[in-house]
Design a protein with these regions (language model features):
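Sec-dependent N-terminal signal peptides
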Residues: 1-4
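A well-ordered secondary-structure block
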Residues: 80-158
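Bacterial signal peptide processing site
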Residues: 13-17
């Protein structure tokens, strides 16, 4: 039964055994498909899911939620942002919660946002920036009141 379960798990993501490419079944697959389908319709390249960069995206989403719910403390947000992104080295976030994106601007773009109000348009607002990305990080965080927030970040890893 364990072999069958493993076969089913790897079949869902094209047969990969690379742990960085295996997508959780929490809506991530649908998000990545929507991004890549929209990109294809716009004549843009595809991005590849990354568990590693999804964890960075999750930490950034938690940091943004702290800002959002605890009085919009920009200095604290920025300090935590720098800590989280320090581990990226030369990798840059080019879409989503970028270094230059103020938390309020992110809120206005609806990325991050509640899962229901998330706007995919923000990902493609600047096609030249989108084209810099090779990897995508997807994160969902459920708040204490049960609201699910979603964030998507695109990463330039080359």
């Amino acid at each position: 039964a364990g072999v069958l379960a493993l076969a089913m798990l790897t079949a869902c993501d094209g047969g990969t055994t690379d742990p960085d490419k295996i997508m959780p079944e929490d809506g991530t697959v649908e998000v990545v498909m929507k991004i890549n389908n929209t990109a294809a319709n716009k004549g843009l390249g595809q991005v590849e899911y990354s568990a590693k960069y999804s964890e960075v995206t999750r930490k950034l989403l938690v940091n943004w939620l702290e800002w959002h719910t605890n009085g919009n403390q920009n200095t604290k947000y920025r300090e935590e942002y720098e800590k989280i992104t320090a581990e990226l080295g030369n990798v840059k976030i080019v879409v989503g919660l970028t270094k230059d994106t103020a938390p309020l601007a992110a809120q206005t773009n609806y990325n991050p946002a509640t899962r229901a109000s998330f706007k995919y348009d923000s990902i493609f607002a600047d096609p030249s920036t989108y084209e810099l990305a090779e990897k995508v990080g997807v994160a969902f965080v459920t708040t204490s009141d049960g609201t699910v927030y979603q964030a998507v970040c695109l990463f330039d890893v080359n």
